[in-house]
Amino acid sequence: MQGQTQSISFDGREIRLTTGRYAPQAGGSVMIECGDTSVLVTATRSSGREGIDFLPLICDYEERLYAAGRIPGSFMRREGRPPERATLISRLIDRPMRPLFPSWLRDDLQIVATCMSLDERVPADVLSVTGASMATLLAGIPFYGPMAAVRVGLLGDDFVLNPSYREIERGDLDLVVAGTPEGIVMVEAGANQLPEQDVIEAIDFGYEAVCELIKAQESILKDAGIEQVKPEQPEEDSTLPVYLEKACTKAIGEVLSQFDQSKADRDSKLDAIRSSTAETIEALKDSDPVRKLVSANSKALPTSFKALTKKLMRQQIVKDGKRVDGRSLDQVRPISAAAGVLPKRVHGSGLFQRGLTQVLSTATLGTPSDAQEMDDLNPSTEKTYLHHYNFPPYSVGETKPMRSPGRREIGHGALAERAILPVLPAKDTFPYVVRVVSEVLSSNGSTSMGSVCGSTLALMDAGVPLKAPVSGAAMGLIKEGDEVRILTDIQGIEDFLGDMDFKVAGTDKGITALQMDMKITGLAMGTIAEAINQARPARLHILEKMMEAIDTPRDGLSPHAPRLLSFRIDPELIGTVIGPGGRTIKGITERTNTKIDIEDSGIVTIASHDGAAADEAQKIIEGLTRKVNEGEVFSGAITRIIPIGAFVEILPGKEGMIHISQLSEARVEKVEDVVKVGDEVTVRVREIDNRGRINLTLRGVPQNGEEAEPAPAPTPVAPLN
């Protein structure tokens, strides 16, 4: 079980690929490691299924908490449903792998990446992507690889290859680049309003490292004596495609060139052409080869008809520079935007429409206790900004069961979330937890970028002080031989029949998020740079239209949003505020009808719909945490009486005791002879004992309205600026 290990060094970090040692019954397996992070990746192929017209590829990323030396917190103490992070990494593996399998392959393929050990300095996601390529090559699956991925960070003015978690948090860029020898196949990034040129340079920097990892995979194959299985296109029967080209080209071309029609009309006309063609084929003789082929395979006609439609649409774009809706290549669809479309019980709302794509986004403000706790391998323990994306079937005019969010919904929500994160206010100035939900009401391309635009409108309507508004656009690509055409603001059919979906989001200063997926085996750096630069005027045009609806965040919050009051206390006094078993803080919340959150750093956040109640809770906490000195004089009410003395609330929530001997200069037989519960008295702090108990006295202190020595002003509480 020795296996073979190939190592490659990046900026002092070594990546190791071990093959031939683990999972011997999998089609191919590799343990890919960097630092103490180890990911086992397997690729397995089983016989194909009859009658399908797609590649049944499944990519799964599995997290095991033992990788970080932890036991799951669930009742069963076992990992359950994959967390959102695992779903996103599964998509990260799938997106660069899928276009590298031949279009004719119909075998069941499964790639499983299992994180076996996690080093907090080394994220496991990009290792999983590279491992997926290596495992697929070892499995002998037809594949246009090798493919590899790296992460690029930006610290100051320097690019960092495969940065640690801390470097990612500190930096202005988190970019993942995947590529093949032919070019780049996938890009995903979050950025802190970086200029386009900086992002382009980062992608180029990352691709150089990708090429080194590709060479390492080729070396492993060579040393093991394994020859890569290159995809070979099987002979296809051209009978049906040739027939359709003669019978349908003119009719399809006429439909695609009718620019003033709606999507529904165009789809209806194309369906009518296909149905008419099916009837014509059905009327052919039984011995006719076209009828035989269509009768034997129900998918043959729809597949060939779609291929012809794709070919004609692409030709129209390349040769005539016209799209199916008549737009030029760099033209954005008509845009409308509105803020505050829902009643203010919804804290903020925005409606964004671009062409036939319509998204309604809502923003909800919550308290720190509403933060999402993360039970996964990510060092971050909670999320205070959440974006959830919903894609109901009616948005595309279909009927389907309504189920929980799938991978696509989770991925689109994460992209929109990432686009907004860099412009959110600092926690110190705006301590709210914010949840945005984007409801896709109508879909015809680029709903994720529509969600970004809708989010901006909703957040500004909710009064969230964004650093800058964010808009987004989706770019497309048609590549026919050496002819390349980049499309701005692609709609559904252009996404479906095109070669690229490149989403770019950002402010007027720069990019905050981007995501590129390909349907071809690689794209040159120059074309990617052109797409990024072409997206900027589109983004700014969209942003201008959004600003016509709302150009600055609202001055006030919704009357139904909670009011938060934040201040700092000495972290060593947190226990005093909480009290034994939480008794003190529970009493404060019940007395004032507020929610109170205290962080380990000493930041206290009080949430209430009543400002006066929040102020009262703050006074109580300040009283509890204020240092009391011997000799200070306070006025307060008698709260309770015991045989040996009486208790006085000298500050909100803080009591001291007057011993019976300190009630009067004369001897007192019974406490009630001098004071009763509710009496207002003026007391002096006689001493504070070694257990922190405050002992008070009435002796020598003026009473009954006589002027008393004022207490010193309380220590100022540091505001949260």
Swiss-Prot record:
Pfam families according to UniProt: KH_1, PNPase, RNase_PH, RNase_PH_C, S1
Top enzyme class: transferase
Subcellular location per the Swiss-Prot or TrEMBL entry: Cytoplasm
Residue ranges, annotated region (Disordered): 700-721
Protein name: Polyribonucleotide nucleotidyltransferase
Pro residues bias spans: 711-721
GO-annotated molecular function: 3'-5'-RNA exonuclease activity; magnesium ion binding; polyribonucleotide nucleotidyltransferase activity; RNA binding
Keywords: Cytoplasm, Magnesium, Metal-binding, Nucleotidyltransferase, RNA-binding, Transferase
Organism: Synechococcus sp. (strain WH7803)
Residue ranges constituting the S1 motif domain according to the UniProt record: 631-699
